[in-house]
Amino acid sequence: HKWHIKNKAVFEDVGQWKRPWYFKKDESETMYQAVQRESKQTRLTAGILDGSTLGKIEIKGKDALEFMNLMYTNAFTKMKPMTSRYALMLGEDGMIMDDGIVCKINDKHFIVTTTSSGAPKVLAHMEEFLQTEWPHLQVYLNSITEQFTTFNISGPKSRDIISKVFTNVDFTNAAFPFMTFKTLDYKNTRARIMRASFTGELGYEIYISPQHALELWELIFQYGKKFNLVPYGTETMHLLRAEKGYVVIGQETDGTVTPIDINFNWMIGKNKKDFIGKRSLKRKDTAREGRKQLVGIIPLNKSQFIEEGQHILECENLPSKITTPVSYLGHVSSSYHSPNLNHCISMAMIKGGNKLMGKKLFVSTSKGTKNIPVEIVNPVFIDPDNKRLVS
């Protein structure tokens, strides 16, 4: 925290935490300028985020595998030890509750991450079902959020930097593929490195005890200096993930969104007998046509900016005085100016959105009655083939 203050971080509240929102290069730099700079440099060389606030929960016991299969939509039975998997947790109503990464050490030992603000809720959710529905399972839960500092380093030069720091680790693609992790000794303490990314670039997450965190953070910057490694905050994190089409729980989701609504069908274990929310996914309303679905939108006039929260409409203009309800198709959930594409990119939840690709629609604006013409596109704006992720 002191390093962030020293390096001109501006903070925002995230759950119970103060997180760096963005870093000012100098006093005259605006938030917009800082975020554009951080985003561009991360994709050009490398950037690093303090992700320590992510919730971390340890699951142990002889029935840990069965418990995990019940808690998440994903299947973990065939998952190999020392691999990771992006996972989705639903409520009993079948709506998305939280997401995170599941690390499988073995069938009796898992570590999961949660959203920063969702950690207490997820742990309580797990405890409730363990105590009231499955008391026969021998499983033990432990919150380890504050036991590990987490760094997320990503960008095409991230491997070059991190290999200088951990010289005893082989970071080649063959030895350290995407969505695997390693544990190692680092200066008489245990560290964990996972190859994962929330930016869409080559990336790694480093977990280490808080006592060694500052020393390691500064060492990473020492080796990253030649690559102009930049620290970035939560706003740049959100912009970079939007370019890649990654969702944020609570932004693309609002308690009424299912995995199918955001094109996450692939995250539902097809052969699983049961998991929390499975029955609700088969309800008539949950499976009906015309539900809001996640899409990307770009303005036809690339100089225009789309505001978050605005409505998606079929009409080009609104009357100066609205006397009857205006039919709308959905809303804008995320919107940023992409410095890497040089125009505004937005994500939206639109009724039947997957069938509207390429269609021209309109987005309302707070600046008048003339709506912004947009095109409905795939929400993945950068690297749709994942070549950067697995490079």
Annotate each language-model stretch with its function.
Residues 43, 99-100, 194:
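Short beta-strand/turn micro-motifs at beta-sheet edges
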Residues 1-13, 19-30, 106-108, 113-391:
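Conserved, structured C-terminal
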Residues 1-90, 95:
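Acidic, proline/glycine-enriched N-terminal capping motif
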